Regions:
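Ser/Thr-rich, low-complexity intrinsically disordered terminal regions
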Residues: 1-131
Length: 131
């Protein structure tokens, strides 16, 4: 769940462009490390069917701008045990895979906003591919 973008400016400026793009989309920045060219947004929740997914966006600026979805899903446990208050009925699992439809709904607005701000999406990241 990674997308890559090329940039033709300084690393600091590319990080600032990415930050402003995410802020324009309504994300809130949780952690920003300008000296490491890295930032992470606050956790956001989204429902798909009966599952709830929480995700955050991580951005790392190196040779390219890497946009990564870090996600976890909440799963309803169907155990025979009962709990008072129901707090143990939901289990959180780290998920490195989100449904494709959900990935698209997250990445499409980011792609559009980054492109509008001068960051160009890399279509082919394989070795030997022309930039």
């Amino acid at each position: 769940m990674i997308r890559y973008f090329n940039y033709e400016c300084a690393q600091e400026e590319a990080l600032e462009l990415a930050k402003n793009s995410l802020l324009d989309l309504g994300y809130k920045i949780d952690l920003m490390a300008p000296e490491g060219y890295f930032m992470v947004t606050k956790m956001q929740g989204v429902k798909k069917d009966i599952r709830q997914y929480d995700f955050r966006i991580a951005v790392l600026v190196e040779d390219r701008v890497e946009v990564i979805i870090v996600a976890q899903r909440k799963v309803f446990k169907r155990d025979s045990e009962t709990s008072i208050g129901g707090k143990d009925l939901i289990q959180t699992e780290i998920s490195d895979k989100l449904p494709y439809r959900l990935q698209r709904s997250i990445f499409y607005p980011i792609n559009n906003e980054f492109t509008k701000n001068g960051l160009v999406k890399v279509e082919d990241i394989t070795f030997g591919a022309n930039d």
